[in-house]
Design a protein with these regions (language model features):
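Metal-dependent phosphohydrolase cores
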Residues: 1-167
Length: 167
């Protein structure tokens, strides 16, 4: 867990944007580095581990996207999971946290983070959103397969992502 925390903070330290110090302060004060996810990566530190796995996937499949946007989308896409559910999706809560920290997002970063779980046309028109969804599917599917031997779950996630890509 500490190694992933150090790697994430190292990546974020290389991003020179307004509000980054406030975001890092939020990450350290919240349960971002210690909590697990609800449906996958349930272990302590699972949320940060999942976000780092998504970052690693996205970096390996960058498709000409900026390294900074990849880091922002991957490492912050599930930031909203650090707050209680409020009837809105965690993508929207992630955007709210970043706004509260004064952290500006590009339109593509906003779309990718806010809609990474929805099926909409921007999956086809926003390469960052498409890559984030693929990375999220990859990390989630691999975790479920490894920890629960849910081959059908991993295959199902891959099949869904593949169907989106072929659309």
């Amino acid at each position: 867990m500490n190694q992933i925390k150090e790697q994430i903070l190292g990546i974020l330290g290389g991003i020179d944007r307004a509000g980054m110090d406030a975001v890092i302060e939020y990450l350290n004060a919240s349960n971002y580095f210690t909590r697990g996810c609800y449906h996958h990566h349930k272990e302590r530190g699972g949320l940060a581990k999942h976000c780092f796995e998504v970052y690693t996937f996205m970096s390996a499949h960058a498709e000409g996207l900026s390294a900074e946007s990849i880091a922002v989308a991957a490492l912050f896409h599930d930031l909203g999971k650090t707050r209680r559910r409020d009837g809105r999706g965690h993508g929207q809560r992630s955007l709210d946290i970043l706004k509260e920290c004064g952290f500006p997002l590009t339109p593509d970063e906003r779309t990718a983070i806010g809609r990474h779980h929805s099926v909409s046309a921007d999956f086809l028109t926003c390469p960052l959103r498409r890559l984030l969804t693929r990375g999220d599917c990859d990390s989630t599917g691999r975790w479920k397969h490894e920890h629960h031997n849910k081959k059908s779950s991993a295959e199902g996630v891959s099949r869904i992502c593949g169907r989106w890509e072929k659309s």
